[in-house]
């Protein structure tokens, strides 16, 4: 298929080449001018590929070229009938070479005489002539490429002249073109009379096979005027594969791109070429900025005073030849191969690359690249990697088309890049195959990568992080501190560690660290370090084992400087001894566990050795041993566990600066109730023996007893903090007489304050309070019973015995112990009526909550609406110690 090129050539696209990038036609035309001075006729131009023309030209000597030219029609004036012409872009030729370059020959790419071109324009396509290269100031602009015979040059409107900076510039161009015509005609006739050779390979290319400086400058000027980067053009070698061409074309399958008016690009090319000095730098000159801005304004809607081909008939308009096309046709042969490519419209490309962050518009990304970024081994693929999308590495939000998988990237225009050292895969940011990145970074496996910019100005990528495939299981941290050792069964014997039996099969040697290939190690339940064994009833490390022994046996009381929620891990386990000891108790560590284990092993050994009946002395020794075990399970160990798991202070979040109202006070109480309910669940799970209950029984016991537990704990806080004068619900929510009346629950508040005063009248100790609170958890059950009612009764009886032991430790008189036990159990019974009244109040409030504007958290609303009616209906009843 033939594609029309920018300067009027007809070029057949070879099947082994693909050209990608913006303005490929224009750059390809310049390349053809420099490297391949082709034949005069379009038929001859399409007969051979450009590489063959260049080779044919190099093999042809200057005398042979002259003979071939004269042998075509027998007259040196035959050159005036050539249909095409080219620019002589070499500014470093000798004066003799400059004069000979003005005369065109059939096998060379030099420029024909302007007069001859005007004569040939009657029947053939018009092509722009080139001015003389004698003066550096006469570097041809884009308007001069049109030639003096262009019909719109003389009739250009005043608006166009204003855009071209000033009207005097147009007159200067016309004067230079007339001088070039006169000088070219006279010098051409003189050379024809003398019989001098008119063109040669050395005179055209400057004696070398490299691209001339003027050609590079022209490419750079056009690139600058089009809003492209010039850094890539400075380091290009003459090879075909290192051409950093970029292509701006309409999206395939989408609406056709609107062609911009030709005046603006002409004005940019004119200004950029005329203002360019002889000493060319590697950076973009500052003179290009005004022309960029003027063209950007023109794109926004200014009337440029000229029109395209649709207004060709109007006077005062500037028309361009139909072959000067900067757009890629949508019907090219490779259209099917680039369905996923995202092209851009031409006006946005000329406006320059937008500042980051990039807009989400599909045509808002500018494709820039530097072939030197890929090294010598990437020379062949440098022009193919069009979608580097380096803006995404800077944190931009642009994402490219295609999926995140490597196969999908290969099918589209995205290419995978590998670093030389690591060999890590960098894929595109997939729209459907992987996860999204927070900062728009490239994520090949769906994992987000920390955003980071380029390592240097050269475009090198930073050292890649270790990315694991999706099939690799990450290491699990140590278990939650709520994992409490069961006192009823030796679960540590079959403990497989927090990781379970994890086997990694999809890992790669160069990706995963070496510790992933070892069997998972058992970790300490306290700090997460490597466990050395089961110590004091829990799987711990040696450090936590020694710490627990010293802390549990010692008399020192540890206090947390924070809120009893410090992080205990391998590196911060020594920061807070109080939280570390609490975590030890939560894990089920007890001083008696070690003694019990030794005595149990001794008992098994004795049973294996003894095959006959035991003697009376042995029976007495066994009884002594059992009594010793029972005596060892004394109250200090049990109390240490209760003290360690006691919840800390919980705030309600009430705003005391606002005036007290019924809705505000009750809403704060409901919020406080939900927060305390979370702590009650954690506390109950840490109680010794609670986890041995059936799971349904655990949930039922907590949902039925939460109100009594909160009331009992609030009475204790009121006694210890405000001496039972007020209700100390939370540090930021204390009820006085006014708030009791304002909350419309004055009678319930009076009964709760009376309960708080009972702690003072009975002189309840902290040890008694802790044991009574634990016993209160097992004091309300359904009438139909629990799923494992027998074990519940045994567990409740054990806590009653513990309370009796606590009482017996303080008193030696059995009569006083019985009286004290009676007083404490009566106090526990008094909590149940108060809790029932509060159940009724909260249930009625929940029904009217929408009318009184009282907020109920979701968890509280669910428990009140589901479990409280069972208590009010009598399906769930409390267990009383005394007859009511």
UniProtKB/Swiss-Prot annotation:
<dbReference type="Pfam" id="PF00105">
    <property type="entry name" value="zf-C4"/>
</dbReference>
<dbReference type="Pfam" id="PF02166">
    <property type="entry name" value="Androgen_recep"/>
</dbReference>
<keyword id="KW-0754">Steroid-binding</keyword>
<dbReference type="GO" id="GO:2001237">
    <property type="term" value="P:negative regulation of extrinsic apoptotic signaling pathway"/>
</dbReference>
<feature type="modified residue" description="Phosphoserine; by STK4/MST1">
    <location>
        <position position="615"/>
    </location>
</feature>
<comment type="similarity">
    <text>Belongs to the nuclear hormone receptor family. NR3 subfamily.</text>
</comment>
<feature type="modified residue" description="Phosphotyrosine; by CSK and TNK2">
    <location>
        <position position="248"/>
    </location>
</feature>
<feature type="region of interest" description="Interaction with KAT7">
    <location>
        <begin position="589"/>
        <end position="883"/>
    </location>
</feature>
<keyword id="KW-0479">Metal-binding</keyword>
<dbReference type="GO" id="GO:0008013">
    <property type="term" value="F:beta-catenin binding"/>
</dbReference>
<feature type="modified residue" description="Phosphotyrosine; by CSK">
    <location>
        <position position="204"/>
    </location>
</feature>
<dbReference type="GO" id="GO:0003700">
    <property type="term" value="F:DNA-binding transcription factor activity"/>
</dbReference>
<feature type="modified residue" description="Phosphotyrosine; by CSK">
    <location>
        <position position="338"/>
    </location>
</feature>
<dbReference type="GO" id="GO:0008284">
    <property type="term" value="P:positive regulation of cell population proliferation"/>
</dbReference>
<feature type="domain" description="NR LBD">
    <location>
        <begin position="633"/>
        <end position="864"/>
    </location>
</feature>
<dbReference type="GO" id="GO:1903076">
    <property type="term" value="P:regulation of protein localization to plasma membrane"/>
</dbReference>
<keyword id="KW-0963">Cytoplasm</keyword>
<dbReference type="InterPro" id="IPR001628">
    <property type="entry name" value="Znf_hrmn_rcpt"/>
</dbReference>
<keyword id="KW-0862">Zinc</keyword>
<feature type="modified residue" description="Phosphoserine; by CDK9">
    <location>
        <position position="61"/>
    </location>
</feature>
<feature type="site" description="Interaction with coactivator LXXL and FXXFY motifs">
    <location>
        <position position="685"/>
    </location>
</feature>
<feature type="cross-link" description="Glycyl lysine isopeptide (Lys-Gly) (interchain with G-Cter in ubiquitin)">
    <location>
        <position position="812"/>
    </location>
</feature>
<feature type="cross-link" description="Glycyl lysine isopeptide (Lys-Gly) (interchain with G-Cter in SUMO)">
    <location>
        <position position="367"/>
    </location>
</feature>
<keyword id="KW-0805">Transcription regulation</keyword>
<feature type="modified residue" description="Phosphoserine">
    <location>
        <position position="237"/>
    </location>
</feature>
<keyword id="KW-0597">Phosphoprotein</keyword>
<feature type="modified residue" description="Phosphotyrosine; by CSK">
    <location>
        <position position="288"/>
    </location>
</feature>
<dbReference type="GO" id="GO:0005654">
    <property type="term" value="C:nucleoplasm"/>
</dbReference>
<feature type="cross-link" description="Glycyl lysine isopeptide (Lys-Gly) (interchain with G-Cter in SUMO)">
    <location>
        <position position="485"/>
    </location>
</feature>
<keyword id="KW-1017">Isopeptide bond</keyword>
<feature type="compositionally biased region" description="Polar residues">
    <location>
        <begin position="197"/>
        <end position="207"/>
    </location>
</feature>
<feature type="binding site">
    <location>
        <position position="842"/>
    </location>
    <ligand>
        <name>17beta-hydroxy-5alpha-androstan-3-one</name>
    </ligand>
</feature>
<dbReference type="GO" id="GO:0005497">
    <property type="term" value="F:androgen binding"/>
</dbReference>
<feature type="compositionally biased region" description="Low complexity">
    <location>
        <begin position="55"/>
        <end position="79"/>
    </location>
</feature>
<feature type="modified residue" description="Phosphotyrosine; by CSK">
    <location>
        <position position="516"/>
    </location>
</feature>
<feature type="compositionally biased region" description="Low complexity">
    <location>
        <begin position="174"/>
        <end position="196"/>
    </location>
</feature>
<feature type="region of interest" description="Interaction with LPXN">
    <location>
        <begin position="516"/>
        <end position="883"/>
    </location>
</feature>
<dbReference type="GO" id="GO:0030521">
    <property type="term" value="P:androgen receptor signaling pathway"/>
</dbReference>
<keyword id="KW-0863">Zinc-finger</keyword>
<feature type="zinc finger region" description="NR C4-type">
    <location>
        <begin position="524"/>
        <end position="544"/>
    </location>
</feature>
<keyword id="KW-0832">Ubl conjugation</keyword>
<dbReference type="InterPro" id="IPR001723">
    <property type="entry name" value="Nuclear_hrmn_rcpt"/>
</dbReference>
């Amino acid at each position: 298929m033939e594609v029309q090129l920018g300067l009027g050539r007809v070029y057949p696209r070879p099947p082994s080449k693909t050209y990608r990038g913006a303005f490929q036609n224009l750059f390809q035309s310049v390349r053809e001018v420099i490297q391949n001075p082709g034949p005069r006729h379009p038929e001859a131009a399409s007969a051979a590929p450009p590489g063959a023309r260049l080779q044919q030209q190099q093999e042809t000597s200057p005398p042979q070229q002259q003979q071939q030219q004269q042998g075509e029609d027998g007259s040196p004036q035959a050159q005036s009938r050539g249909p095409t012409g080219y620019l002589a872009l070499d500014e470093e030729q000798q004066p003799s070479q400059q004069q000979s370059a003005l005369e065109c020959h059939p096998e060379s790419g030099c420029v024909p005489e302007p007069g001859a071109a005007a004569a040939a324009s009657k029947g053939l396509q018009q092509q722009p002539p080139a001015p003389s290269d004698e003066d550096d100031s006469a570097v041809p602009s884009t308007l001069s490429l049109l030639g003096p015979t262009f019909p719109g040059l003389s009739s250009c409107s005043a608006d166009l002249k204003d855009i071209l900076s000033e009207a005097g510039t147009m007159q200067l161009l016309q004067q230079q073109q007339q001088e070039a015509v006169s000088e070219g005609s006279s010098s051409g006739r003189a050379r024809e009379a003398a019989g001098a050779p008119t063109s040669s390979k050395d005179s055209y290319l400057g004696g070398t096979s490299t691209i001339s400086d003027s050609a590079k400058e022209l490419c750079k000027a056009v690139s600058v005027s089009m809003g492209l980067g010039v850094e890539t053009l400075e380091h290009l070698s003459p090879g075909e594969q290192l051409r950093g061409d970029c292509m701006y074309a309409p999206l395939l399958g989408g609406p056709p791109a609107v062609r911009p008016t030709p005046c603006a690009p002409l004005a940019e090319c004119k200004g950029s070429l005329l203002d360019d000095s002889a000493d060319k730098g590697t950076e973009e000159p500052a003179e290009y900025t005004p022309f960029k801005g003027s063209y950007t304004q023109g794109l926004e809607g200014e009337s440029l005073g000229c029109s395209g081909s649709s207004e060709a008939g109007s006077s005062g308009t500037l028309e361009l030849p139909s072959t000067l096309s900067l757009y890629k046709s949508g019907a090219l042969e490779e259209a099917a191969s680039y369905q996923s490519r995202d092209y851009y419209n031409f006006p946005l490309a000329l406006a320059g690359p937008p500042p980051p962050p990039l807009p989400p518009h599909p045509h808002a990304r500018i494709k820039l690249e530097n072939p030197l970024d890929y090294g010598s081994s990437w020379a062949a693929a440098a022009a193919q990697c069009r979608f580097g999308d380096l803006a995404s590495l800077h944190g931009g939000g642009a994402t490219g088309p295609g999926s995140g998988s490597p196969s999908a990237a290969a099918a589209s225009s995205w290419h995978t890049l590998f670093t030389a050292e690591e060999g890590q895969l960098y894929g595109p940011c997939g729209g459907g195959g992987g996860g999204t990145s927070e900062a728009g970074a490239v994520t090949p496996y769906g994992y987000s990568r920390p955003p980071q910019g380029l390592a240097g100005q050269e475009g090198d990528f930073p050292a890649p992080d270790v990315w694991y495939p999706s099939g690799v299981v990450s290491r699990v941290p140590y278990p939650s501190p709520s994992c409490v050792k069961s006192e009823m069964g030796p679960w540590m014997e079959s403990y497989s560690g927090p990781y379970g039996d994890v086997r990694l099969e999809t890992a790669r040697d160069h990706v995963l660290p070496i510790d992933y290939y070892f069997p998972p190690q058992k970790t300490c339940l306290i700090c997460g370090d490597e466990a050395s064994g089961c110590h004091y009833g829990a799987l711990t490390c040696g450090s936590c084992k020694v710490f627990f022994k010293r802390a549990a046996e010692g008399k020192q009381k540890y206090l947390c400087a924070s809120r009893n929620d410090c992080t205990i891990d391998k590196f911060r386990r020594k920061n807070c001894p109080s939280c570390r000891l609490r975590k030890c108790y939560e894990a089920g560590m007890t001083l008696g566990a070690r003694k019990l284990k030794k005595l149990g092993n001794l008992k098994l050994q004795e049973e294996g050795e003894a095959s006959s009946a035991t003697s009376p002395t042995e029976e007495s020794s066994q009884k002594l041993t059992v009594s010793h075990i029972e005596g060892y399970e004394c109250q200090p160990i049990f109390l240490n566990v209760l003290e360690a798991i006691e919840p800390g202070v919980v705030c309600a979040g009430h705003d005391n600066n606002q005036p007290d109202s019924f809705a505000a006070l009750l809403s704060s109480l409901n919020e406080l109730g939900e927060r305390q309910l979370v702590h009650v669940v954690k506390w109950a799970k840490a109680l010794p023996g609670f986890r041995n209950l059936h799971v349904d029984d655990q949930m039922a016991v907590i949902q039925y007893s939460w109100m009594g537990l909160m009331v009992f704990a609030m009475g204790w806080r009121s006694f210890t903090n405000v001496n039972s004068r007020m209700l100390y619900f939370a540090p930021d929510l204390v009820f006085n007489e006014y708030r009791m009346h304002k909350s419309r629950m004055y009678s319930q508040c009076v009964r709760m304050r009376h309960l708080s005063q009972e702690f003072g009248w009975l002189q309840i100790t902290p040890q008694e309070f802790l044991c009574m609170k634990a016993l209160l958890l097992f004091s309300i059950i359904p009438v139909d019973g629990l799923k494992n009612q027998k074990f519940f009764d045994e567990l409740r009886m054990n806590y009653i015995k513990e309370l009796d032991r606590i009482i017996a430790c303080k008193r030696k008189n059995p009569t006083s112990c019985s009286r004290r036990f009676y007083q404490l159990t009566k106090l526990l019974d008094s909590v149940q009526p108060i809790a029932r009244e509060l159940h009724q109040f909260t249930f009625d409030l929940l029904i009217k909550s929408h009318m009184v504007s009282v907020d109920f958290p979701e968890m509280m609303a669910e428990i009140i609406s589901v479990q409280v009616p069972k208590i009010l209906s009598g399906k769930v009843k409390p267990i009383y110690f005394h007859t009511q």
